[in-house]
Swiss-Prot record:
Pfam families: DUF5868 (PF19186). It comes from Acanthamoeba polyphaga mimivirus. Belongs to the mimivirus L31/R44 family. This is Uncharacterized protein R44. InterPro entries: DUF5868.
Amino acid sequence: MKYIKNNVLDLGSKDSYIKFNLSTVIDYIYNQIPLDYAEMNKIYKNICTELDDSPEFQSNLTEDDEYVYKFNEILKKCYDEQEMTKRKIFDPDFLNYKLINELHIYLTKKSPKKLVIKSINSIKLVNNEGVNTDINGTTNVDWKLHFWPEFTIQNSECLTLHDIIIACYKIKSHKFENWYELYCNMFTEFYVFQNSNDKNIWKEIFAVIKFDHGC
């Protein structure tokens, strides 16, 4: 199966395929498309916080909306099928390596805003752990940004990969690191709902993402 055709990403027709492929996409986002700290620091430089000396991390209660990310063109070794096979830790049931390869090739040439998600008009992501209060791994910008325990992206026309990227970082409290707030590449709950009208049939997704707050 080819997952990307004519700027359209097909996550599959069966619920199990959609679940597996969406978890792969989210894993890829957190590893290959990080938020751009330098740009985010410029955007929110005038936001003042009074919590920098707090023993526990707290996100900003004021909702924000401007996020800038970047694309790492060098594919991490954890996504290299040959490397994983050589190290005897290749697991095709853990990640969809073919999808990752297609995504990476696409994004070296085009913007995530161009990649439309096929037949999915709404995705609600929920962070199963809530805010990670551990200050380890946080940056000064994390204190200035808001944390959404859940966030919904929806568009009656189409969602894009860009929308998913933004949602993934909205629901993360440690927005610039993946160790103290690690995505576990799984969902604790996942549902696909079918909807239709006189003209179209589409899907809506509800997903509770499993995070590990480290040790």
